[in-house]
């Protein structure tokens, strides 16, 4: 593929550093997955290692040029290759009676939607390479400048672990920022509720505003004050001052108690 030009529209930045590829593979191998679903096969740099695990594998690729290359070069079979947009795929349909590990180098523009689809699915673990800044927001501490609605949402449902940081020079074409490999593991003790995410978006809508002011267009102020006080919180509290668990407790009390 000497004449191949990465697509800016698809956000293609291929991992070309062999040391990084081997580190990712070693980490995935240590997780001892039952099966693998790789998002964005690309030219198959990581794929060639993942196939050595000799476990069920599916690779998702949207670029028709790469699909042809992967099949012509016999890197993947028709059965192993899933063609099309990952956001239009049912994550639960890849394997029956198996819980595959999801992994991939994801374009920044679709990282949040993919994580949401992962949360909605039955899959339990996701090894994700993403922009360093995005990873920082996912892992941000309460009351920090990076703490956000989506970060709090993910932290409530997931255990998020930084695996290692990856320099931008490990990719071709070289992106403007460094990347981070993270592991997302679902917390078994909580059930997914997408409406919690909608609630958080409103809570964090204007960070400098008090929580009550961000929610008063949806709930009566007296009603909000009563619930906040029952949670032993100050009435001037802001969303970014609350932990994911505190925010979920407020969500349950505010939304479930609404007449």
From Swiss-Prot:
Source superkingdom: Bacteria
Gene3D superfamilies recorded: Ribosomal RNA adenine dimethylase-like, domain 2, Vaccinia Virus protein VP39
GO cellular component terms attached to this protein's record: cytosol
A biological-process GO annotation: rRNA methylation
GO molecular function: 16S rRNA (adenine(1518)-N(6)/adenine(1519)-N(6))-dimethyltransferase activity; RNA binding; rRNA (adenine-N6,N6-)-dimethyltransferase activity
The EC number(s) this enzyme carries: 2.1.1.182
Localisation: Cytoplasm
Keyword Transit peptide: no
Catalytic activity: adenosine(1518)/adenosine(1519) in 16S rRNA + 4 S-adenosyl-L-methionine = N(6)-dimethyladenosine(1518)/N(6)-dimethyladenosine(1519) in 16S rRNA + 4 S-adenosyl-L-homocysteine + 4 H(+)
Binding positions (S-adenosyl-L-methionine): 13, 15, 40, 61, 85, 105
Keywords: Cytoplasm, Methyltransferase, RNA-binding, rRNA processing, S-adenosyl-L-methionine, Transferase
Similarity comment: family membership: Belongs to the class I-like SAM-binding methyltransferase superfamily. rRNA adenine N(6)-methyltransferase family. RsmA subfamily.
NCBIfam families, per database record: ksgA
Function recorded in the entry: Specifically dimethylates two adjacent adenosines (A1518 and A1519) in the loop of a conserved hairpin near the 3'-end of 16S rRNA in the 30S particle. May play a critical role in biogenesis of 30S subunits.
Protein name (Swiss-Prot/TrEMBL): Ribosomal RNA small subunit methyltransferase A
Gene source species: Mycoplasma genitalium (strain ATCC 33530 / DSM 19775 / NCTC 10195 / G37)
């Amino acid at each position: 593929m000497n004449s191949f030009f990465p697509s800016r529209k698809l956000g293609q930045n291929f991992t070309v550093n062999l040391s990084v590829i081997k580190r990712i593979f070693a980490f995935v191998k240590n997780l001892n997955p039952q099966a693998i679903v790789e998002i964005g096969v690309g030219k198959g740099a990581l794929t060639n290692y993942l196939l050595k695990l000799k476990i069920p594998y599916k690779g998702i690729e949207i670029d028709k040029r790469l699909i042809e290359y992967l099949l012509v070069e016999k890197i993947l079979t028709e059965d192993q290759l899933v063609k099309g947009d990952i956001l239009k795929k049912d994550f639960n349909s890849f394997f029956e009676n198996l819980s595959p590990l999801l992994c991939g180098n994801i374009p920044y523009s679709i990282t949040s939607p993919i994580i949401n689809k992962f949360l909605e699915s039955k899959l339990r673990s996701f090894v994700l390479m993403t922009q360093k800044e995005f990873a920082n927001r996912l892992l941000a501490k309460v009351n920090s400048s990076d703490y956000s609605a989506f970060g709090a949402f993910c932290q409530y449902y997931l255990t998020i672990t930084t695996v290692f940081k990856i320099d931008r020079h490990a990719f071709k074409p070289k992106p403007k920022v460094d990347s981070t490999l993270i592991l997302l593991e679902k917390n078994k003790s909580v059930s997914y509720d997408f409406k919690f995410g909608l609630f958080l978006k409103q809570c964090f809508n204007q960070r400098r505003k008090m929580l009550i002011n961000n929610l008063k267009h949806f709930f009566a102020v007296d009603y909000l004050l009563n619930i906040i006080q029952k949670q032993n919180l100050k009435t001037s509290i802001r969303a970014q001052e609350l932990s994911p668990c505190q925010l979920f407790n407020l969500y349950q009390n505010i939304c479930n108690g609404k007449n």
